[in-house]
Design a protein with these regions (language model features):
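Central I-helix of cytochrome P450 enzymes
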Residues: 92, 96, 157-165, 192-243, ...
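Conserved cytochrome P450 catalytic core segment spanning the I/J/K helices
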Residues: 49-53, 92, 124-134, 153-223, ...
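Cytochrome P450 heme-binding "Cys pocket" and the immediately downstream C-terminal segment
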Residues: 234, 305, 357-397
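Cytochrome P450 heme-thiolate "Cys pocket" and heme-binding signature region
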Residues: 209, 295, 333-364, 391-393
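Conserved cytochrome P450 K-helix/beta-meander segment immediately N-terminal to the heme-binding cysteine loop
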Residues: 307-335
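Cytochrome P450 substrate-recognition site 1
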Residues: 1-60, 84, 88-97, 111-140, ...
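Conserved cytochrome P450 K-helix E-x-x-R motif and the immediately C-terminal K′/meander segment
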Residues: 163, 234, 253-296, 316, ...
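Cytochrome P450
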Residues: 52-63, 73-98, 106-115, 137-163, ...
């Protein structure tokens, strides 16, 4: 495992759709390992996803979640079940959009709605079967993708996404634009572009694409799995709610990002969710850079390597009762998902570990804490917890196969 994640390997990047929508691998997630990638990643971490930067975006997360809580509290009738798949995706997407592009209304909001639609198409297209990805050495593989219309689909999606990014960058660089009180992600990227001569406009667009792919999908999927497990394990839900509500005792006060450091049991719930339901069960494929020998086996150069973190999280050699949702297993131990504990690697490890873990963890923990604090959650009438399907689906991101419908009741204390 150490060899695969930290040794002579690189991320396998011959993913046809991803290569196109990341402007020829000008991003972080899909770019090949080289000096240029190392420089971009260093800038990305220091400028965009550092702890200080995550803290600066807390206002947007608190505002977005606050709007959701108000909306759920005022819905009519109050006994109506809520589709959490749609609700949570819209929430996280709205937060990423607010952080990336700033406040939106009117025509801007309409254009963003179109962007959301095209982005959803992109995620579906990236999960489609591509002959080039599975048979990269066969000349006919690209012909097959063209024949079934996959290449044309990628191209259309790319052009629409690029058009939106170009419009946003132009608006932010307009000398007559009124600067907001807080810089959004595009402001930060433009500032970086002006300071760093090697950073191009395509780099900016590719990094924005990374933010949406990594931020929107993985966070909403993790939240859905967490709430699914909690509704099937009501004792765990009550324990998590008791911790949050004992901390936030003041009426009318909502959970704040600063509260998260004191919610130890909630963090165990998130760890246990990621152990059983990593957003990407197979990490982004890697390949060897050189011929190497591992445990007596010869591994040729350019060998593809797949890391099954889903299986690692359920390995009985590492975990007691591995199929059981039991957050208490993390009590009193320092196991985390930041890449140093190889039994729990939902976001990878080594030099290709996801650089945005702090932001993703904050989004998931804060949203989950807020929903558990403000509402009591029940299944619709006639539905038992045993009826809640835990079947998943997806090629790159593994999400619930069926929507999760729950009834939130406002907690009055």
């Amino acid at each position: 495992m150490l060899f695969v994640l930290e040794g002579n390997i690189i991320t396998f990047l011959n993913i046809s759709g991803a290569k196109l929508i990341t402007y020829g691998q000008q991003d972080i997630a899909f770019s090949p390992y080289n000096a240029s990638w190392r420089e971009r990643r260093k800038l990305f971490v220091s400028e965009l996803v550092s702890s200080k930067r995550v803290q600066s975006f807390a206002y947007a997360l608190e505002a977005q979640v606050g709007e959701l809580i108000q909306s759920l509290s005022l819905r009519s009738p109050p006994t109506e079940a809520v589709n959490l798949n749609e609700t949570l995706f819209t929430l996280i997407d709205g937060f990423i959009g607010r952080v990336a592009f700033g406040s939106m209304n009117g025509a801007k909001l309409m254009k963003y709605a179109k962007f959301q639609q095209v982005f959803s198409e992109a995620m579906v297209a990236l999960s489609a079967f591509s002959a080039q990805d599975f048979f990269p050495t066969l000349p006919m593989s690209r012909w097959f993708d063209k024949l079934v219309g996959l290449e044309a689909r990628y191209q259309r999606i790319f052009l629409e996404l690029d058009s939106y990014f170009e419009m946003v960058l132009s608006q932010h660089m307009d000398p007559g634009r009124v600067k907001p009180d807080k810089d959004d992600l595009v402001d930060v990227l433009i500032s970086l572009w002006k300071r760093q001569g090697k950073v191009t406009k395509d780099h900016l667009k590719a990094l924005l694409m990374d933010a949406f792919i990594g931020g929107t999908t993985t966070s909403s999927v993790t939240l859905l799995w967490a709430i699914s497990e909690l509704i099937k394990n009501p004792a765990v839900m009550k324990k998590a709610q008791a911790e949050i509500r004992s901390l936030v005792r003041v009426k009318q006060r909502l959970v704040q990002v600063d509260d998260l450091c004191k919610l130890n049991y909630l963090k165990m719930v998130v760890k246990e969710t990621l152990r059983l339901h990593p957003p990407a069960p197979l990490l982004v494929p890697r390949e060897t850079m050189d011929h190497v020998k591992v445990l007596g086996y010869d591994i040729p150069s350019k060998t593809r390597i797949f890391v099954n973190v889903w299986a690692m999280g359920r390995d009985p050699a590492c975990w007691d009762r591995p199929e059981e949702f039991y957050p208490e297993r993390f009590e009193g131990i320092d196991t985390d998902f930041y890449g140093s504990h190889y039994e729990l690697l939902p976001f990878g490890a080594g030099r290709r570990i996801c650089p945005a873990i702090p932001m993703g963890a904050t989004i998931v923990e804060f949203t989950l804490a807020s929903l558990l604090h403000s509402f009591d959650w029940e299944l619709p009438d006639g539905v038992r917890k045993e009826d809640v399907s835990m079947e998943g689906t997806g090629r790159q991101v593994f999400c619930r196969k069926t929507p999760l419908y729950l009834v939130p009741s406002v907690y009055t204390g």
